[in-house]
Amino acid sequence: MVKNRNERQVYFMLHKIPDNLTGRDMDILNILWKSDEPLTASQIASSDQGLTINTVQAVIRKLLKEKLIKIDNIVYSGTVLCRSYCPTMSEDDFALSQFNCEYRKIQKRISKSTLVSALLGSEKNPDVIKNDISELQAMLDEYKEKL
C-alpha cells in the first residue's frame, strides 16, 4: 500500500484506475477493504448474499489483471489449499487516484487554484477552512523547496 504523500504522488501518476469497473467489481473491492485480513474467494462469496462463487472468481481474475488486488497467501480452507486476496491500495488511495484521473480530463478547463478555491468555498466551518489553508500552505512550501 502507498505510505506517504510523496509515494502517493508517484503512485497516482503511474497508476490509472480502469474506466470499466462494474458495480460487482466495486462490491468485491469494498468487501476486501472492510476486511481486516486477506480473504479467499469463498469467504468473499459468503460475505454477500448476492454473490456467487463463479461471479467472485471472474471478478477476482479481472481485479488481479488490473492490479487492484493481489494474491496475499496460500491458505487452507478446510482441507483444500486456496489463495487469499487483498487490495493493492487503500480505499482512500483508490478514491484519490480516481479523482486524479478525472481531474486530468478537465485540467485544461479548470485550474488547480480554481479547484482549490471551489473546495475551500464548499466548506462552511471557518476552523476547518483555516486548518485546510495551513495544510495547503505547508504543502506548497514543501514543493517550493524542491524546485
Enumerate the predicted regions with their spans.
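Amphipathic alpha-helical dimerization/coiled-coil segments
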Residues: D93-K144
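Short alpha-helical segments that sit at the start of domains
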Residues: V2-D27, M139-E142, K146
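Basic amphipathic alpha-helical segments that dock to polyanions
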Residues: I28, A58-E66
